[in-house]
C-alpha cells in the first residue's frame, strides 16, 4: 500500500514536471519568435514640409495636425522598406532652429528624438530658413503679372536669396548635421536635397505663376541651396542625396502623371509647390540607393 502511494506521488510529480516543462517550452518557443518580428533598428526622420509630406494624404494617425506628417513621406517609406522602428518628428514649417526649440504647442525640438540607439537619420531641411522658400515663391508669384516675359522677381529680390543661403543656411545645416552626429554617433545620416520646383526654361502660367525670366532665377536659388546642403554634408560625413538630376522634368509644370511637385493651380492638392506621393516615392528610392552604396 505504501509502495503504491509512493508510485502515485512520483507519477504526480512527473506529470507536474512535464506540464511545467511544457509551459516553459511553449513560452521559450513563442516569445522569441514574436520578439524577432519586431524591427530592431531605429530610424529618426527630421525636417520641414518637404520631409513631412505636407499635403499628401493619408496623414499619420495621432501626429500633430499642424506638422502635416504624411504616412507616405520618404522617411515613412524608407522605414517600411527596411523594417526600421521609426520616430517621425518632421514638421511643416520647420527651420533648422526647430531642431533645438519647440515649433508649435505640443511639438518639441526635433533633435530630442535623436538618441544614442538611433541607427539611421533621414532629413530634408534648410529651405525655410531666412524665409527663403516662402519669400522666393511668394514674391515671384506676386510680381509675375507686372512683367510675364521678364524677370520682375529677380529685379526685386536681387542677391538676397543667395546671400541668405551662403551666410545663414549653409552654416546652420552644417551645425545641425554635426549635432545629430554627436547625439547618434553610430547612425548613418542621410540628408536629401530639394527636387526642382520649376522647369529649365519657360514657365507654365497659370499653373505656375512665375514670369518666364524668373524661371532661371528660381532654379539658380534652388541650385545654390542644394549645393550648400551638399557642402554641409561633405563637411560632417553625412550622406547627401542629390535630387537635381532625378527630378529634372518632374517639376510643377510637368504633366499630371509625370510631375513630382504640385503646381499652384489646377491641382486638388491641399499644399502646392510641394512634392506629391510620386515625389515622396522618388525621394525614398534615392535614399534607398544611398543606403545600399
Predicted regions and their residues:
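Short amphipathic alpha-helices and their capping/turn segments at secondary-structure boundaries
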Residues: 27-44, 103-122, 173-188, 288-291
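Charged, often glycine-rich, active-site loop that binds/positions anionic groups
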Residues: 94-111, 253-267
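Oxyanion-hole/transition-state-stabilizing segment in secreted/luminal serine hydrolases
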Residues: 54, 104-165
Amino acid at each position: 500500500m505504501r509502495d503504491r502511494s509512493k508510485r502515485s506521488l512520483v507519477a504526480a510529480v512527473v506529470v507536474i514536471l512535464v506540464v511545467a516543462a511544457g509551459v516553459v517550452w511553449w513560452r521559450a518557443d513563442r516569445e522569441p519568435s514574436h520578439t524577432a518580428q519586431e524591427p530592431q533598428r531605429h530610424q529618426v526622420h527630421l525636417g520641414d514640409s518637404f520631409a513631412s509630406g505636407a499635403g499628401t494624404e493619408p496623414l499619420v494617425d495621432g501626429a500633430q495636425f499642424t506638422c502635416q506628417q504624411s504616412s507616405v513621406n520618404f522617411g515613412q517609406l524608407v522605414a517600411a522598406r527596411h523594417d526600421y522602428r521609426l520616430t517621425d518628428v518632421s514638421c511643416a514649417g520647420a527651420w533648422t532652429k526647430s531642431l533645438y526649440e519647440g515649433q508649435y504647442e505640443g511639438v518639441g525640438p526635433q533633435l530630442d528624438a535623436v538618441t544614442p540607439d538611433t541607427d539611421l537619420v533621414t532629413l530634408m531641411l534648410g529651405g525655410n530658413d531666412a524665409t527663403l522658400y516662402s519669400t522666393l515663391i511668394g514674391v515671384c508669384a506676386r510680381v509675375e503679372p507686372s512683367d510675364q516675359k521678364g524677370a520682375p522677381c529677380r529685379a526685386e529680390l536681387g542677391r538676397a536669396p543667395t546671400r541668405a543661403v551662403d551666410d545663414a543656411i549653409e552654416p546652420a545645416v552644417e551645425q545641425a548635421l554635426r549635432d545629430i552626429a554627436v547625439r547618434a554617433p553610430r547612425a548613418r545620416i542621410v540628408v536629401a536635397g530639394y527636387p526642382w520646383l520649376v522647369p529649365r526654361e519657360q514657365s507654365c502660367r497659370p499653373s505656375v505663376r512665375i514670369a518666364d525670366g524668373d524661371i532661371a532665377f528660381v532654379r539658380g536659388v534652388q541650385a545654390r541651396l542644394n549645393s550648400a546642403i551638399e557642402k554641409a554634408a561633405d563637411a560632417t560625413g553625412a550622406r547627401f542625396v542629390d535630387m537635381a538630376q532625378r527630378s529634372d522634368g518632374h517639376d510643377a509644370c510637368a504633366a499630371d502623371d509625370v510631375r513630382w511637385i504640385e503646381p499652384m493651380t489646377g491641382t486638388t492638392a491641399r499644399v502646392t509647390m510641394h512634392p506629391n506621393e510620386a515625389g515622396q516615392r522618388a525621394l525614398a528610392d534615392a535614399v534607398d540607393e544611398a543606403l545600399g552604396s
